[in-house]
Amino acid sequence: MENIAPALLDWFYTNRRILPFREDPTPYHVWLSEIMLQQTRVSAALPYYERFLAALPDIPALAGCEEEKLHKLWEGLGYYSRVRNLQKAAKIVCAQYGGQLPADYNALLALPGIGEYTAGAIASISFGLPVPAVDGNVLRVFARLYNDPRLVTDPQVKREFTARVMEHQPPAKAGDYNQALMELGALVCLPNGAPLCEQCPLGTLCRARAAGTALSLPQKTPPKARRITPVTVALVLNEGRVLLQQRPAKGLLAGLWQPVLWEDTTLTAAETAARLAALGLDCTGAHFTPLPAAKHIFTYIEWHQSGYFLTVPEQPAPAGCVWAGKEQLEAAYTLPGAFKVYKKLLLTKLL
């Protein structure tokens, strides 16, 4: 196949989006942006990116940030293991590399939370190294370009696709080439619908377009079925404060704060009262008002939430819990997006 780089780069320089991490592509900026964009759309991530950089402008600041502040800066993005790994890696970079990311692909790959794609993006965009950065967008472009029906999730197939990507990469413009492929996949060679083939700079070379098979590519492993998990939530209020409990240090939503809840069960009001009493909470005279149902989807788990709202007498928080007022809820304690329906309700109650 004819080398795609000239046409691709011409298109990219004319059509690329103006993004802050492209305008100032320092290693830290590229790293942060790539981690944020792993599970988040560009438009949704940009406000978080700007806010995060304003608070933590460099790697030493990230390394030294308090956990609650770090979680608060990430609140709303989800997948909190991303930001925990960011900080773990930042601490290693400060200890081993003087607070600057190393200009070495393998050294980047050894850092927590940095996989092959992210290491390639940092190395090529920020350091100009001729290495691949192959994400889902790039795999989709090349599956269609070569009309290749194999599973792109197969490790051997991905290695072969990566080799193809490198066959076309101009070493002196590795970063621009990698970004151009990502941009083409994001703006033109679209997933989940008809690609905009008439706008594609590679349209005359694309074998799937010629064969009429673009919509069926790339082939992927069918998604794993999510496990439905019932969750009972108790929004316990007292004197303008809500009772929060901290999740375990490991596992789903590790270390974050949440309303009192019980997973894998749907409890009646009486059963909820008994569970709260077992925590050491005095619910004397409390009226249990049903909460609206809420649903939240994790990667492989789907929470179906229900529960109760109640007000209890003034008392100390049980072990592992805190009482939090409206200001604390907004500024200090990070409630994951799984509870956004109930957080909105809480903020109307906590006057």
What are these regions (language model features)?
Residues 1-18, 23, 186-351:
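Intrinsically disordered, low-complexity, charged terminal extensions of DNA damage-control enzymes
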